[in-house]
Amino acid sequence: MRKVISGAMPPGLAAAIAMALAVGLVATPASAASAVGDPAHAAVTHDGETPADWAEVDDSVAAPARTLTADLDANDKARVVTVKDVDGAPVITAANVKGRTQATAVVEQQQAIDGAVAVAVQQKQRLVAGHPMRTSQTGRNVSSDPYSESQWALRTLEAGPSWSLADGSGQTVAVIDTGVSREPDLAKNLLVGWDVIRGRSDGRDDQNGHGTHVAGVIAAASNNGIGGAGLAPRAKVLPVRALDAAGKGYWSDVANGIVYAVNQGAGVINLSIGGDTDDPSLRAAVNYALASGRVVVAAVGNEGTGALTYPAAYPGVIGVAATDRSDRVADFSNSGSAVDLAAPGVAIMSTVPGGFASYSGTSMATPFVSATAALLRSAAVARGLGRVDVLRALQASAVDVDSPGVDSRSGAGRLSARNALCAAGACSYGLQAAASMKKRKLTVRLNRETVQRVILQRKVGKKWKQVSVRSTMASGVAVFKVKKRAKAYRVVVPATSETSAVVTRPLKVR
């Protein structure tokens, strides 16, 4: 049985509660029709740790109300947040209150509601922490965009070879943040989204810049002559504004944003945010997303400590640390059990309102992992790879950068987008090799830009004997010198854990 409230209220308190509930309730539009289509969630799994059932009744429903409001003073502004199970989906409402007395009474009332699975008291807090940084780094361009030279992270992650395998087409990544500005480099890939704070259907407003920067890392268009490129340049971004211009907000708004993103069909949810509070509404929303087959990626925090940061610390969420250009874990990056993976997060060039800027933080590392998840989902659908375990592909293919093996600073290692795609089977799909002979030079060309080990063989009698072994250049081309005349040669791309064997047709030296 649900707890029933009894006893008289202090004079005027009943009216105050009624007013709080009347004007302070907000909830996600859970019944809204999908605006982005079906991203084939059934084709992708995210195993790892099994998240708790979001609909399991939390201890907060039966806890004494005064324990939930103990941190409030007489004049503190707060929210009483309730998570309800409505037809198998979470509905999260929030009542604005002032002071401990009013908050306690509202908590008791919400605990008695049929279908309540969690009740929380929240205060507004800062949930983002990006660090602007100037940079003059240069290097080989991965696109024709003007800021491509400054995008060292794309080269480290092997974006070019990755794009020959997948580009994010057909996938949507929700960015739950300070909103996303309508910048030219994002316009083609930016959906309308939702503004949770204002309660309107448009998340394309960012008075902070954090969310716009994150979105650009994921899906800025490539080769359009503007700015730089995102790691998944053809993925769509679903902007959800849950934090204000100062990067502050309530966990209930973030939770509502997560539920909205799931209901709108986003396959990947990026949370470049974090706090030290394990909030039941946030936990329920994250578990709802994971149970719905979504990939949830979150920053582990920038304090340089081992403190747990939520939502990164929740089971099933991919927690991301930050590395620098030298593949070292950044000094500011948090460590601990929440860290599953690391990604570039120092001097990251991306879009901001009105232009471009270089930021550092685990907030900047997180969208690289989200973008790679979108690439994996895109490849799974386009190439018919079947069920892909995103977390397993990311971790199995990571580059070891800290202590050998899995460690508390970098998790499984530094992200490699190309390696992750290969681990999922995308590299072997459709790989072909063509060989040609001219003046005793045998040239082999693969049908994609990739470095592969290739073997030159010569026919001796009825058998093929190995002559030479080398790797193709990044362009997928390798050249062998042959000496014997009137002999048949062929090139073999040997089978590996990533590729199936490919054999060219025999050629003769004339």
Q: What are the residue ranges of the model-derived segments?
A:
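Hydrolase catalytic cores
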Residues: 215-218, 238-244, 267, 331, ...
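Subtilisin-like serine protease catalytic core
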Residues: 33-37, 161-192, 200-251, 267, ...
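C-terminal subdomain of the subtilisin-like protease fold in secreted/lumenal serine endopeptidases
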Residues: 253, 264-271, 280-281, 285, ...
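Substrate-binding/access-modulating region of protease and related hydrolase catalytic domains
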Residues: 163, 168-169, 239-316, 326-329, ...
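Primarily auto-inhibitory N-terminal propeptides
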Residues: 2, 13, 19-139
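Solvent-exposed loop/turn segments at secondary-structure junctions
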Residues: 87-88, 99-100, 123-127, 178-182, ...
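Low-complexity, Ser/Thr/Pro-rich intrinsically disordered linker/stalk segments at domain junctions
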Residues: 422-510
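Protease zymogen maturation seam
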Residues: 34-38, 112-172, 180, 184-185, ...
